[in-house]
């Protein structure tokens, strides 16, 4: 790494730090966008097997080129702006939806040294930036000049705000036990404790002592990304297709990409906050980025499994779950963790 920095400084001089930052951005965003594309392929394959079908198998070997074909098809489609729509906001809204999903990766650590911006308040940054995705959805529904799109946008806004509260309380618990807002520190703290000393690191991760918070965060993450069974914002049987009903071509594809990018982000954050990030589950295996990818893949599989298994919630059921079940659980467990930390049985010392 030092040789690379010296080489870059020799070529670019004082501009090298800015160039190096741009290179890191490309190295993170490009594979992530490719991962988003192939997550759609993985989803169709997994759900196909669950429904005793084959899934995509025509474009390329085993259908592996299907995501590229879908992207090219959408790229060649016309973006139709409805009459009566606010054209400027209609075009900008998809970009406002995907921008927070990409910007959040600036502080997501892949290892303790591989992170774009290792800032002390990275947890606060994540909570702030991810809450901005709802603006693109609200503006898309309003600018479309369609009752179905506007109704879907209002549903989505209420849903995302409701479940952000539960996710925020879950992360406050993580903050309490980690005593840090830095994501790298949050992972390193999970490698301490009695079980880690015995070589069973996975028992010292936050998922076990904060198990109710882990479940609340995971389920709220599914709701936050508008995925089944919480996809009332785009309920096909009720409001046609929700907030993006009037979109076509690449404008529609960007909303699609934003949804899957948010799925990957929630999987990464769940792995970092509760499952030890890049840490190995046992001491005799080395830590590394592959562990983080394995944990993310397992959580992404749960997203797909939920979609194939559960029917959609009614809107009132969804709101009741968020406000009358998750919020009380979070408040109770915050008190439990606080008392636990002040007691002689504190396991986070």
Swiss-Prot record:
NCBIfam families, alphabetized: PRK06076.1-2 (NF004741), PRK06076.1-3 (NF004742)
Assembly and binders: NDH-1 is composed of 14 different subunits. Subunits NuoA, H, J, K, L, M, N constitute the membrane sector of the complex.
Source superkingdom: Bacteria
Enzyme class: translocase
Main localization, broad class: membrane
InterPro entries from the UniProt entry: NADH_UbQ_OxRdtase_su1/FPO, NADH_UbQ_OxRdtase_su1_CS
PROSITE patterns tied to this protein: COMPLEX1_ND1_1, COMPLEX1_ND1_2
Pfam families for the chain: NADHdh
Annotated membrane topology: Multi-pass membrane protein
Transmembrane segments: 20-42, 88-108, 123-143, 167-187, 202-222, 249-269, 284-304, 325-345
Name of the protein in its database record: NADH-quinone oxidoreductase subunit H
GO biological process, one term: aerobic respiration
GO molecular function terms noted in the UniProt entry: NADH dehydrogenase activity; oxidoreductase activity, acting on NAD(P)H, quinone or similar compound as acceptor; quinone binding
One GO term describing the cellular component: plasma membrane
Keywords: Cell inner membrane, Cell membrane, Membrane, NAD, Quinone, Translocase, Transmembrane, Transmembrane helix, Ubiquinone
Enzyme Commission (EC) number: 7.1.1.-
Similarity field: Belongs to the complex I subunit 1 family.
